[in-house]
Every structure is written in structure tokens, then in C-alpha cells.
């Protein structure tokens, strides 16, 4: 028999518990997608015909997003809402390195150092090109070819900038079929060697090549993919961690949820139950998966509002930001090649807000637990 006091106490407990559970904690596995910019009319809030197969994305702490549009050989700039930012009246900046398509930009980094100078000024943004060249932008309507001669036989699909021994270096992921490696350049864009055995996994898997490289918390994370001669990928993949001098640290993750991994992003604490996790974007199946940043253990995949994993046609960079015009610091920004890489999409993912009815169900569930506990106590 429940007295009025019993029911009142249970109700108070249920309310306290329900209110203490944030919507993010309850529904963090579901995310809302907002399409900001696309080359396809009507697909996003803004249209830009230059956004064709964007791969890398780079930015300074306050700058717009800079896109590496591989299939238009350009970079385009957008704020956090997708508004186009023109440079000197130019809607796009040309990236040299050869014709568009097979030679356009892939990986990209922001350069905040005084090195990597072109024409007497530091290149503020640096691009790796698919044909093994590197370009840099110092101003104006076009970037400058920093390495006039392509690295022989190289296919650059990723780029990182890091410091080692007081000097700054560029690290390019060369994903050439069966012979891929990490190529290193000094701050004068000259190729250098960090020593025999650098960027070598003692237990590397046959047929896998470096697909991308990214600096995370002072170490270089290299994503490996099993690629075919035409550049298409097979299922599988792994991620290694290296020091900036090229020494192998450990295998972070392997197989399982990885499918031609490429993009990396460390989630902020506000990103629901995935807060603080390392997110890895698969180019192979277009999924975004979360991993424990210390152990590399797989945690889960980002789901859409239908409860199914979000999947993209040709997923590349994913990024969080802490500043910038119209930037949502709680959003995961992503870029995707669509329509067989003849189109592009720039969007954001945010933790879905649960419906009021769902919250009521939770409260009733907590109330039920409270009643059951009271029965056991009074039995």
C-alpha cells in the first residue's frame, strides 16, 4: 500500500533523476545533419559550382574554412554557415599542379610559421596534390607551385605540418599502389629523410599504403588503406601513431569498423556520449566511428535520426572548431564528394534534440523504477 507520502517521495526522486540526465546523454547516438554548401542546386542552403569533390579542409583559429576541391583544382572559402568568402573578388582560388581531376588538391594545412616561403612570404595555406606536387597560397587569386617537379611516382592524398627538433616539416601521405610511404619536406619545400626506418610499422599489413596523415596532440596519426591500382579502396584499414621524427609509437586501431579511414577529429566534451573520443571518417563506406582516444577501442558509429549509421558517398575531412565567424563549436563539420565525385557537399552534424514525448517516456520509466524499488523495500 502506497501512502501519499510514498508517492510524493517517488515522484521527487523520478524528477531529480530525469532532470539530471541530459538529452545529449540519452540520445547522443543520433545526429541531425545540416547541408551548408553544395554544387548541386537545392541540396544545401548555398550553392557553389566550384565545390567539386572536396577532400581536405584547413583553417586558422579565426579564418573561414578553406576547401581543397580535388576535382575542380580550386580552394573555396566559407564561414560556419556556408556563406562564400571571396578573396579580392575571386569566388575561388586556383590550385596549380596540373589539370583538374587527376591532379587537384587533396590534403591541406594552415601554416602559422614563418617558414615555407614562396615569393618572399610564408604560404598561409599549403596543399598536397594528387600528382605528387605541393602548392602554397600567399595571396591573390592563385596558389603557387611550391615543388615544380612532382615527387617521382607519388600520389599525395594527405598532408600534415609538424615540428621536430626545433624545425618544421611537411608530411605527405603517398598512397601509390603497393609502394606508398610518407614523404617529408623541410620548410624550404625540399625533400628530406628522417632516417632509415622512419614511418615504418614493424607489423605493417601487405597491400596497405598511407592514405592520410594528421597531427593530433603532438603526434602523427597515419591512416592506412588497401587500395587498388585505380585508387579505389577495399574494405579494411588501420591507424598507426608516430612521433614527428618518424619513429613508430603503436598501432592505434585495426580492422573492425575501419574501412579505408581518412578523416580524424577529436570530439569536444559537448558532443554527447562521444565527447572526448577520437572520430575517424571512413572513405570506404562513409561511416563516422568513435574510438577511445587512449586505448583505440571501438565505441560506436554516429547514427542519423532514423537510428541507422550515417553513411556518405565519398567522405573525406571531418573537423571541429573553437572559433571563427558563424562557427558552431558543438558541430562536426564534414565534406563529401557526391555524384561519383562530380559534385560536393559541405555540412555539419549536431547532437539531435529529443522530442518532448521521448523525454516523457524516460520520466515514466524512471518513475516505474522508483515504484519497483519502493515495493522491494516495503516487501
List the predicted regions and their residue ranges.
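Sequence/structural signature of beta-propeller domains
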Residues: 28-352
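Short linear Ser/Thr-Pro motifs
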Residues: 11, 22-23, 38, 358
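N-terminal secretory signal peptides that target proteins for export/translocation
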Residues: 1-9, 378-379
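Membrane-interfacial segments
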Residues: 213, 376-377
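Bacterial N-terminal signal peptides
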Residues: 13-23, 368
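A short, hydrophobic C-terminal helix/tail in secreted or cell-surface proteins
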Residues: 355-373
Amino acid at each position: 500500500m502506497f501512502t501519499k507520502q510514498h508517492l510524493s517521495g517517488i515522484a521527487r526522486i523520478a524528477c531529480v533523476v530525469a532532470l539530471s540526465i541530459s538529452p545529449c546523454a540519452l540520445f547522443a547516438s543520433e545526429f541531425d545533419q545540416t547541408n551548408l554548401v553544395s554544387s548541386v542546386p537545392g541540396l544545401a542552403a548555398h550553392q557553389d559550382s566550384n565545390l567539386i569533390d572536396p577532400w581536405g579542409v584547413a583553417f586558422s583559429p579565426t579564418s573561414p574554412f578553406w576547401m581543397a576541391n580535388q576535382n575542380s583544382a580550386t580552394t573555396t572559402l566559407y564561414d560556419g554557415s556556408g556563406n562564400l568568402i571571396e578573396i579580392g573578388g575571386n569566388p575561388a582560388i586556383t590550385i596549380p599542379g596540373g589539370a583538374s581531376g587527376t591532379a587537384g588538391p587533396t590534403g591541406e594545412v594552415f601554416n602559422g610559421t614563418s617558414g615555407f616561403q614562396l615569393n618572399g612570404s610564408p604560404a598561409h595555406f599549403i596543399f598536397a596534390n594528387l600528382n605528387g606536387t605541393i602548392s602554397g597560397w600567399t595571396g591573390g587569386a592563385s596558389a603557387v607551385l611550391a615543388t615544380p617537379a612532382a615527387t617521382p611516382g607519388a600520389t599525395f592524398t594527405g598532408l600534415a605540418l609538424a615540428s621536430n627538433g626545433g624545425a618544421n616539416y611537411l608530411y605527405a601521405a603517398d598512397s601509390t599502389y603497393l609502394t606508398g610511404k610518407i614523404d617529408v619536406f623541410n620548410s624550404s619545400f625540399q625533400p628530406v629523410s628522417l632516417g632509415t626506418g622512419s614511418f615504418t610499422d614493424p607489423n605493417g599489413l601487405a597491400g596497405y599504403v598511407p592514405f592520410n596523415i594528421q597531427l593530433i596532440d603532438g603526434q602523427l596519426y597515419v591512416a592506412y588503406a588497401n587500395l587498388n591500382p585505380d585508387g579505389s579502396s577495399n574494405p579494411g584499414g588501420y591507424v598507426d601513431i608516430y612521433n614527428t621524427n618518424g619513429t613508430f609509437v603503436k598501432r592505434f586501431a585495426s580492422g573492425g569498423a575501419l574501412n579505408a579511414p581518412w578523416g580524424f577529429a577529436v570530439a569536444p566534451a559537448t558532443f554527447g556520449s562521444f565527447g572526448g573520443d577520437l572520430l575517424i571518417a571512413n572513405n570506404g563506406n562513409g561511416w563516422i566511428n568513435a574510438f577511445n582516444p587512449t586505448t583505440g577501442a571501438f565505441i560506436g558509429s554516429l547514427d542519423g535520426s532514423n537510428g541507422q549509421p550515417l553513411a556518405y558517398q565519398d567522405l573525406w575531412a571531418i573537423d571541429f572548431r573553437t572559433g571563427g565567424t558563424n562557427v558552431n563549436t558543438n558541430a562536426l563539420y564534414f565534406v563529401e564528394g557526391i555524384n561519383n565525385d562530380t559534385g560536393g557537399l559541405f555540412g555539419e552534424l549536431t547532437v539531435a534534440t529529443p522530442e518532448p514525448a521521448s523525454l516523457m517516456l524516460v520520466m515514466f520509466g524512471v518513475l516505474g523504477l522508483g515504484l519497483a524499488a519502493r515495493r522491494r523495500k516495503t516487501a
